[in-house]
């Protein structure tokens, strides 16, 4: 199985909302090696070898990683503006929903791949969506995000052990309080 976390490369983006996918994978591993246009780490979950992938293209070109990787057994983890901070949503497939990284992946492999959407919304009305996803989380949001990242890593382990259907039933109804 391959787990791909979406984000933008570089220190400038490391704490931005758009880099939630990278943050989840960094929680699973802190040892990364260079691939052709990605970083990877091999981990073990319940005896199964899992390859973690962080594309080193910018978000809008995330699909290019599939020039080098198989795509028959993957999960993609990424930020979702339409979900509130404190929620994740596991899906077997679907559209891009306006997310350019997912749009890029769909252009390479189609939309039939499992994903974990990580809520980063709601976006304030007076901020452009592109500016919002490239902004850093606040200190208060990071406290919630830490719990969400833990929930995502737990969900990935659960998918490996029990399958996507059981994981959807277990995790899609969980909401971590933001205190708002």
UniProtKB/Swiss-Prot annotation:
**This protein's name:** Peptidyl-tRNA hydrolase
Keywords in alphabetical order, please: Cytoplasm, Hydrolase, RNA-binding, tRNA-binding
Site annotation (Discriminates between blocked and unblocked aminoacyl-tRNA): which residues? 8
Q: Which InterPro entries match?
A: Pept_tRNA_hydro (IPR001328), Pept_tRNA_hydro_CS (IPR018171), Pept_tRNA_hydro_sf (IPR036416)
Pfam families assigned: Pept_tRNA_hydro (PF01195)
Say which species the protein is native to.
Fervidobacterium nodosum (strain ATCC 35602 / DSM 5306 / Rt17-B1)
- What molecular function does GO assign, one term? tRNA binding
List the lineage, top down. Answer: Bacteria, Thermotogati, Thermotogota, Thermotogae, Thermotogales
Instruction: Identify the catalytic residues.
Output: 18 (proton acceptor)
Give the protein's biological function. Hydrolyzes ribosome-free peptidyl-tRNAs (with 1 or more amino acids incorporated), which drop off the ribosome during protein synthesis, or as a result of ribosome stalling. Catalyzes the release of premature peptidyl moieties from peptidyl-tRNA molecules trapped in stalled 50S ribosomal subunits, and thus maintains levels of free tRNAs and 50S ribosomes.
Cellular component (GO) terms are:
cytoplasm
EC number(s) reported in the record:
3.1.1.29
């Amino acid at each position: 199985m391959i787990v791909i976390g979406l984000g933008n490369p570089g220190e400038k983006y490391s704490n931005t909302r758009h880099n939630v996918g990278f943050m989840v994978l960094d929680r699973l591993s802190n040892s990364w090696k260079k691939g052709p246009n990605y970083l990877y780490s091999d981990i073990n979950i319940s005896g199964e070898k899992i390859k973690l992938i962080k594309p080193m293209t910018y978000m809008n070109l995330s699909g290019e990683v599939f020039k080098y990787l198989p795509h028959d057994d993957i999960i993609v983890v990424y930020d979702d503006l339409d979900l509130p901070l404190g929620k994740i949503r596991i899906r077997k497939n679907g559209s891009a929903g306006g997310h350019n990284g997912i749009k890029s992946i769909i252009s390479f492999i189609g939309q039939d791949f499992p994903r974990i959407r990580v809520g980063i919304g709601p976006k304030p009305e007076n901020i452009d969506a592109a500016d919002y996803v490239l902004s850093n989380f606040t200190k208060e949001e990071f406290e919630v995000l830490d719990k969400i990242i833990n929930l995502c890593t737990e969900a990935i382990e659960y998918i490996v052990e029990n399958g996507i259907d059981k994981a959807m039933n277990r995790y899609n109804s969980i909401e971590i309080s933001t205190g708002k």
